[in-house]
Amino acid sequence: MQTPLATPVPVLRLPRGPDGSNRGFAPDGRRAPPKPEVPEPPESRESWEQQARASLRERYLRSLLAMVGRPVCFTLHEGVQVIAHFGATDLDVANFYVSQLQTPIGIQAEALLRCSDIISYTFKP
């Protein structure tokens, strides 16, 4: 038994665009809705601070991503410096998972560094 043929679907043909490749329409064409001239409200101090915090957080998260698999020098309290290969961080960025941690008293194969103990870190991208 044969299967019935599918019902043909009508095709809607759009008018040609402003360039020869039929891509898009001219923004000043008769079909474009007029855009109202609305002045932007002045940014408040709070929105400026929020943008600054968002920018700093994005830079911090990008630096964490760039550190993965690289040797990183961590400066801890009391001026202690340790070097380790950065692996990952937990979801709330409270701990760093590192490997080959070189401390003043020896090398640890794997370790967790609490972010509250870290003063700064440096690495070469």
Curated annotation (Swiss-Prot):
Protein's name in the database: Gem-associated protein 7
PANTHER family linked to this entry: GEM-ASSOCIATED PROTEIN 7
Encoding gene per record: GEMIN7
Main location: nucleus
Domain SUZ-C: 1-29
GO cellular component annotations of the record: cytosol; Gemini of Cajal bodies; Sm-like protein family complex; SMN complex; SMN-Sm protein complex
PTM sites of type N-acetylmethionine: M1
Family per similarity comment: Belongs to the gemin-7 family.
UniProt cross-references to Pfam families, sorted A to Z: Gemin7
Assembly with partners or alone: Part of the core SMN complex that contains SMN1, GEMIN2/SIP1, DDX20/GEMIN3, GEMIN4, GEMIN5, GEMIN6, GEMIN7, GEMIN8 and STRAP/UNRIP. Part of the SMN-Sm complex that contains SMN1, GEMIN2/SIP1, DDX20/GEMIN3, GEMIN4, GEMIN5, GEMIN6, GEMIN7, GEMIN8, STRAP/UNRIP and the Sm proteins SNRPB, SNRPD1, SNRPD2, SNRPD3, SNRPE, SNRPF and SNRPG. Interacts with GEMIN6; the interaction is direct. Interacts with STRAP/UNRIP; the interaction is direct. Interacts with GEMIN8; the interaction is direct. Interacts with SNRPB, SNRPD2, SNRPD3 and SNRPE; the interaction is direct.
All copies of domain Sm, residue ranges: 59-125
Disulfide cysteine pairs (residue numbers): none
Modified residues (Phosphothreonine): T3
GO molecular function, one term: RNA binding
Location within or outside the cell: Nucleus, Nucleoplasm; Nucleus, Gem; Cytoplasm
Record key words, sorted: Acetylation, Cytoplasm, mRNA processing, mRNA splicing, Nucleus, Phosphoprotein
Role played: The SMN complex catalyzes the assembly of small nuclear ribonucleoproteins (snRNPs), the building blocks of the spliceosome, and thereby plays an important role in the splicing of cellular pre-mRNAs. Most spliceosomal snRNPs contain a common set of Sm proteins SNRPB, SNRPD1, SNRPD2, SNRPD3, SNRPE, SNRPF and SNRPG that assemble in a heptameric protein ring on the Sm site of the small nuclear RNA to form the core snRNP (Sm core).
GO biological process: spliceosomal snRNP assembly
PROSITE patterns, per the entry: SM, SUZ_C
Gene3D superfamilies: 2.30.30.100
